[in-house]
Amino acid sequence: MGILGKFNRDEKFIIGGEFYIFFLLGVYALMVGALVPQIRGEYGISYELSGLLISASSVGMIAMNLISSYTAILLGMKRAFMLQHALVIVGLVAVTISGNPVLLLLGMTFIGFARGSTSNYSNQIVNDITKSDASVMNQMAAFFALGACIAPFVVLISANSAGNWRYANYGVSLAAAAGIFITLRMKFGNDGIKTGGAKRGDLSFFKRKKYWISLAAIFCYTGIDISIIGWIVTFFLEAWDTTMQFASGMATLLWAAILVGRIICSLIARRMTTARFILYLSIGMAVFTALFISEITLTIQVAATIGLGLFMSGAYSLILVNAGPIFSEYKLAFGYFFMLSGFGSVIMPAVIGVISERHGIQIGIRVLAVAAAALLVVSILNVRLDKKAEN
């Protein structure tokens, strides 16, 4: 019996639909970075505005992580899910039709809104249906990585072969519309499978040690994850003086390793406790982070990139599973969790940028060691907390 064998027909349809939506989330995430050079070339915008466009997407995502929890209570999970997912279409259309800075910023913000709310809802729905099954959560995350691998090529092919980057936006908008239709067919919330916690407005989850440990872990992880993804091309270009093709290839290699790692994690997640699995991944991340920032040889650097991708791959989903029972119990726990943890993805890359501006990328990238060490400490505390609960 496969990973989904224990679920009924309606549950399988929901999980399969969320896999597709997570694939789209991967596309949305990488399309932001892939579209900016095309938008800059088309509309002649400045580097400052280009940076603001990327930030607008991140800010929109963080804000909607919290707002989406309240809109689900007010509108119902399905209606809120569909309406907020539709914002990605609004955002893609906005950046397609005009080079007006305000419209571009609004478009990227809407894309961020859709990413934040859709990720929140999808994780919560699958977490509730599977009762925090780490294998299913990791398999869903693998679809995100697959979408992330494909997105840059979709924009590149559209711009080079079809002659217009806008075709990529049109295609992704149609794919998003299909995702909304699939959600309409799902039976959850008020018309089927129960999702969300019983305690709708209760904030007592803030008193739970497991919640804070999981939050600290995801804060450190997202800081490492977004920093590696965001700075890897610049790091290889400037620290190793490689070609753009080689540096871009390293970014693709990183995502390929993440994809393979998530598939592996989905297969072995049930063979050990979630806390211990997170600890093992944290150890691997610490080791390969140390190798990554050491700059010994280019060969070791490439190996460290692969190693980081493999060990980063399953941590995110497992940390969500670690706090899964709390998410099921408290309606607002998911939203606050994603909002607060999102600051890790904002602060860490910015700190690296500030240090790199003064001392070079070789020094700035070493900030990753602090986050990796902190994640390892938090993972050890998490294992101890579980052992204490067992006794």
Predicted regions mapped to residue ranges:
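Intracellular juxtamembrane helix-capping segments at the cytosolic ends
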Residues: 117-130, 313-327
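Extracytoplasmic gate region of multi-pass secondary transporters
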Residues: 32-33, 209-252, 256-259
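Cytoplasmic helix-loop-helix junction between adjacent transmembrane helices
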Residues: 107-142
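Helix-breaking motifs and short loop linkers at transmembrane-helix boundaries and internal kinks
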Residues: 44, 76, 97-102, 131, ...
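Helix-loop-helix hairpin linking two adjacent transmembrane segments in secondary transporters
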Residues: 132-133, 139-188
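Helix-to-loop junctions at the C-terminal end of transmembrane segments
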Residues: 64-76, 261-273, 356-357
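Conserved MFS/SLC helix-loop-helix module at the cytosolic interface between two early adjacent transmembrane helices
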Residues: 63-102
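C-terminal transmembrane helical hairpin of 12-TM major facilitator-type secondary transporters
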Residues: 272-319
